[in-house]
């Protein structure tokens, strides 16, 4: 707080000394951005992704992973406290490796003036797209799918405007779910699928949504939906647009822990 008023400084970590500039001043709080780290926090680390400073996809890569876990746990406890709830027992947080875990990503798409496609996450606090050439938090094979998207999109009919593409990794396949201005005509679909299979070099599902349609429609000829295992004995099927936990390992461990806490 500065003179009793809350100031949220983007990129700042607890227990460090910084210089900053205001970016937005409001009645009840201010927003600011770091201009210089004078005395870094012991938990400050070098971000593992070259896009981190511009991309809006991640916000805590500059904080040590274990401290990220502790920070998020404390945020949850603080939120419960503000709601008048106190945890009787706090279990150790479940954590997993910080890289290669995320099994879905929603990417913005824009066709540049030269006809090439920009594919990536929005810049933090902006509508501008940060073109992504790598994303180390994505699980394999999604990083390869990110790389192929600009090439594959160039095969689409020029009058189709693509707004967003979601990449999803199931245990049995990956899916590319496209939100666009219109559906491809029946005669356009085979060429789109051929080019997708050529670029993906592996099993891939193609889903599409246009206009006011709420659910995605599948364009390839496959019949099996995406699936993921939540226990050794239970596997769930899902479609693009339906909720799943982005971290498969954490999901399985959470389910296992909840089952272990049930009375026998």
Language model: regions and residue ranges:
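Accessory RNA-recognition modules of RNA-modification enzymes
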Residues: 1-264
């Amino acid at each position: 707080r500065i003179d009793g008023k809350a100031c949220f400084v983007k990129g700042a970590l607890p227990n460090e000394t910084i210089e900053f500039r205001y970016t937005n001043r409001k009645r009840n709080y201010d927003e600011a951005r770091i201009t210089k780290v004078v005395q870094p926090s012991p938990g400050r680390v070098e971000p593992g992704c070259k896009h981190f400073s511009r991309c809006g996809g991640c916000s805590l890569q500059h904080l040590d992973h274990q401290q990220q876990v502790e920070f998020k746990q404390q945020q949850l406890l603080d939120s419960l406290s503000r709601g008048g709830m106190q945890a009787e027992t706090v279990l150790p947080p479940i954590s997993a490796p910080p890289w290669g875990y995320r099994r879905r990503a929603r990417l913005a798409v824009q066709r540049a003036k030269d006809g090439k496609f920009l594919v990536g996450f929005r810049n933090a606090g902006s509508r501008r797209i940060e073109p992504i050439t790598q994303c180390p938090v994505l699980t394999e094979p999604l990083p390869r799918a990110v790389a192929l998207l600009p090439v594959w999109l160039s095969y689409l009919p020029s009058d189709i405007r693509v707004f967003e593409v979601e990449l999803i990794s199931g245990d049995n396949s990956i899916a590319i779910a496209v939100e666009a201005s219109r559906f491809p005509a029946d005669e356009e679909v085979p060429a789109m699928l051929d080019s997708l299979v050529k670029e993906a070099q592996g099993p891939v599902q193609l889903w599409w949504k246009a206009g006011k349609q709420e659910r995605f429609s599948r364009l390839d000829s496959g019949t099996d939906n995406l699936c993921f295992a939540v226990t050794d004995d239970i596997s769930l099927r899902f479609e693009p647009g339906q909720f799943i936990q982005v971290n498969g390992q954490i999901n399985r461990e959470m389910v296992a822990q909840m089952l272990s806490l049930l009375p026998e």
